[in-house]
Amino acid sequence: MLFPRERLLELEAERLAPYAQKARDTRGREHPEPESPYRTPYQKDRDRILHTTAFRRLEYKTQVFPNWAGDYYRTRLTHTLEVVQVSRSIARALGLNEDLTEAIALSHDLGHPPFGHTGERILDELMRDHGGFEHNAQALRILTHLEERYPGFKGLNLTYEVLEGIATHETPYAPSFKPLYEGQGTLEAQVVDLSDAIAYAAHDLDDGLRSGLLSPGELAEVSFLRDLAREEGLDLERLTELGRRVLVRQLLGYLITEATLATHRRVEEAGVASA
């Protein structure tokens, strides 16, 4: 049985929540192009991002620990893949568009320079007389200008909603870049923002314990971590390597569940009935 694009769009309309961004309602691309016979617009965007040079380069960019510190620690690439997993889990539970969510999640860190947030801060200082440096703006520049894959235009010619999701990406440590876009973006984009913070919380704890920068005893000072440990029968003062993995897994599951429930509650309270 084949599922052509038209049927995929119908399935979205039938199965997704009223407030989900449907691919059939996209605001389109800057440059008109033929539609794929078996992929929706957001599926095409996701695939294009995966095949970029910028995406492959994430493997060698620092998350917290530099690449040479060991192959256990996260890089921008592994962090991105974790954000994709968290984002899709939340999007699926809320009835949002997983393809759009995944495309935004895959591209949300493409503009980061090497050496983590310190590298970005120093680069911003060096570029102050030339407009500064901001990684969301750089991600847009990569996807709309620097990646050259098509003879008729520069960039990947992604849909409006994916580019909007990158421009409006915002976390406590990284403000959004919104000169071309208004509002908070789609709910799918907001889920990626939330998932970014969730992935950070879980893997920074994991990497911190693994490296010795955090001691198991320090975790006992955090009440909900004590509760999570108690549920699994873990002693935070004598945390084994297996215990660390169990704790991180529990933390990740807890945050995903709480984020999903809180988002659903807010959507219901606000009476959101459309994208």
Q: Language model features by range: what are they?
A:
Residues 100-129, 135-136:
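Aspartate-rich (DDxxD/NDxxD/DxxxD) Mg2+/diphosphate-binding motifs
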Residues 67-78, 91-92, 107-114, 127-130:
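Short coil/turn segments at secondary-structure boundaries
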Residues 1-80, 84-90, 98, 119, ...:
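Histidine-centered, transition-metal-coordinating active-site segments
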